[in-house]
Amino acid sequence: MADLKITLIKSAAHRLPKQRAIVKSLGLGRVSSSVVKPNNEATRGAIFHIAHLVSVEEVK
């Protein structure tokens, strides 16, 4: 499986506490920060909850 590059494109400020916690748990801080995470169910579930705040692309 390929990894996922997750980039924060909108701020997590003024969002629900659960959404802010997910952003922090993924290792995202400021807008435009990116992380590479494994493509598994846990990561995809977290992305589902904050899909409106991030962009996701597959990397090999």
Curated annotation (Swiss-Prot):
One of its GO terms (biological process) is translation. Pfam families: Ribosomal_L30 (PF00327). InterPro entries: Ribo_uL30_ferredoxin-like_sf (IPR036919), Ribosomal_uL30_bac-type (IPR005996), Ribosomal_uL30_ferredoxin-like (IPR016082). GO terms for molecular function: structural constituent of ribosome. Keywords: Ribonucleoprotein, Ribosomal protein. GO terms for cellular component: cytosolic large ribosomal subunit. SUPFAM superfamilies: Ribosomal protein L30p/L7e. The keyword GTP-binding does not apply. Part of the 50S ribosomal subunit. Belongs to the universal ribosomal protein uL30 family. This is Large ribosomal subunit protein uL30.
